[in-house]
Structures are given as C-alpha cells and as structure tokens.
Amino acid sequence: MMRRQWGLWLNLALSLWLLTGCQQPAGQDTSARVELGPRPAYLVAQLPEGELKQQLQQCQGPLQPHDFSIGHRGAPLMFPEHTEASYRAAAQMGAGILECDVTFTRDRQLVCRHAQCDLHQTTDILLRPELAGRCSQPFQPADAASGRPASARCCTSDIDLDEYLSLCGKMDGVNPAATSVQQYVQGTPDWRTDLYAGSCPAVLSHQQSIALFQQLGRKMTPELKTAEVSMPFQGRFSQQQYAQQLVDEYKAAGVPPEQVFLQSFDWQDILYWLQAEPDYAKQAVWLDGRYEDPAFDPMQPGSWSPSMDELKAAGLNIIAPPLWVLVTSEEGAIRPSAYAKAAQQAGLNIISWTLERSGRLDDGGGWYYQSITDLTTDDSVALQLLHVLAQEVGVMGVFSDWPATTTLYANCMLP
C-alpha cells in the first residue's frame, strides 16, 4: 500500500511538473512561466479522498501567475526572506503579488525587512565586525548558570543604506543557547533549510524591489512597518513623511495605483493614505492586529471595535486578519467565523496570512491554526483551510511562505 501511495504521489508530481515547466514556447517571457516543484503534489496526496482531492489531481495546465497567490516576504520557507532570490523564487512559483516589508535606515532610506530591528536574525551583520559594533545591542552569549539566553539587537536604523546593501541575507532564526556569534546565527528551524542561503543572497532597498517586481511583471504589496525607534526619527522624519515616502517611490517608478496594495497594522497610516493618496488608498490593506487584545474573539462581534460597517464607512476596502481569525471548528469541519461573515456583509474584501509558515501540521498547527487545532492533524489541512477561505469566506488572496501551494489552488479551483 505504501509503495502504491508513493507511486501515485510521484505520478502527480511529475504531471504537475510537466504541466508547469515544459509547455513554454521558445522565446516566451520567463516571468509568466510557473514551476511548482513537488510540494503542492505532496500536499494533494495527503488530502482525504473527496471532491477537492479529485479536482486538484485532475487539474490541467498550463498554470499562470495569479493574484490570489501572494509571496509573503518572497518564498521564505526555503529562501532567505526579503532577498532577490526569495522574490524570484516566489515569482517562479506563480505569485501574482510580491511583498516588501518596508522600514528605514539611518539615512532615512527605505529598505525591505520584516522588522526594523531584526538584522541580527535575518542577515550576517553580526559576522561583520565593522558593522556589528554599530548594533543597538551587541551580541551577548548565553549564560547557562543564570538561564540567560543569547541575544543581540541590530536595526536598519543603526546603519546607512550602502552598508545595509552590503549585507547578506540568511534564513530567519537564532540559537538562544549560543556562546559565540558563529553559533548564534545558526538558528534555522529544522523544517526549513539552509540549502538556498549560500552565495550571499542580496538584500534590497525598497526602490530596488520595485524595479525587480516590475521586471518580473508582478503586482506589489508593501507593508509600512512600525518603527522601533522614536518618531520623528532624528527629530525630523515623521510618521506621515515615512508613509508618504513609501507612496512617492511608486510614483517615481511610474507604478500605477492599481498595481499596488499598501499595507499597515497602524490604522492612522490607512487614514493618512485615504486623505493624502486616495488613488493608492483604494487598495490599501489594513492588517487587523486586534487579535492581540485578550478580549478579542472572532466569534463575538461585540469584542472588536470599530465594527466592519464603521471600517467600510471610513473608506477601507480590504481587511487582512491572520488565518485563524477567519475560521472556526464546527461539527468536525472548518467553517467561516463570525468575523469573516461580518466582513463579507459589510462589503469588505479580505486577504489573509500566512499559509506554509507553521512547519508540519500533525501537532495541531500552532498559532496560525489555533481556531481549528482539533481538525489540524496532517499537512493537507493547509489545502483544506485554503479551500474554505476561498470558497466560503471568499478571500481575494492569501499570503504564503511557499506560493506554489496557493498558485496551484488558484489555477485549479478559482474562475
């Protein structure tokens, strides 16, 4: 039986590869070529027998890039996040939209990094003595006697743009038990890989990301990251200037508003864009962080404020909560939450995050699956959840750390 299942999986993987990798006419723009690799077929093979599995197995190519499939920081399941290699991998897997999380350097230049102060865990800055000495908090080794973990804090605002661009990206992670810098930077989770982290993956400025995404023919979704330094920075760079500079760089590159999905967790940023940049703000995405409130309950509308109707009336068109907020476990099945239904009824479009960020799912799935832990027993739940989000919640897109999965679903199951 195991040999038969392996054979079926191998046949499906080969079929998907043939559909996606071998049907490009000579001379065709490679930015439109989609190559999924074996992971989507592996997930399909894990699905229980039924209509979803059958439809995905019978799906015919060629597959195309799709806006439903959003590359979360590129393709960081296997490539260092926010690097050129990661973005190119996401585009190759058919992500129609690519994300640059935006923060700023000491000379107030915008760069792609998930957090202003994560350089110690996503780049090789600590291995560069000339730059490591500029970190806000130098490396401190673990102390087993006191139980103190190893730590460091290196921020984009500690260095200038040219220094930032000299860094190499690495897989996100640190080793809290480290007693040396060399040990500390080796913290990649075992369900990811360092296989594609060699040869100094290039980090990018925001402007460079725009040029790359234009070259790849993809739409763009920058997230204005919350500053981890006091604003106004250096006494003269305000939050509104920061938000405006982000939009100005798209204007300068000639990127039309319909190609850009601005994002922020800060509602004040959304309001600023609605007033100052109404054309770009039509597709602004409010990343809903209200789940951090202990009283928040996606099944209880009274636990969140403003209401969905109030958000829509303020001019918001797209709301983006994490995966678990949009679903609930009901009679052994994944179903839309009250939050999802309220957003639908208010006329809000929905984007969600982040698929393929939880490692293996046979242990309940962790944070992103917390509302359906009892149903999360194997890796195929990623596709089952995606199916409910697309067909019952009606999301317009899903961020993924491995966009091949969302690309396959979008091509095979969406109009």
Placement of each model-derived feature along the sequence:
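Phosphate-group recognition and catalysis centered on beta-loop-alpha active-site segments
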Residues: 22-415
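Bacterial N-terminal signal peptides
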Residues: 9-20
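Bacterial N-terminal signal peptides that target proteins for export
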Residues: 2-10
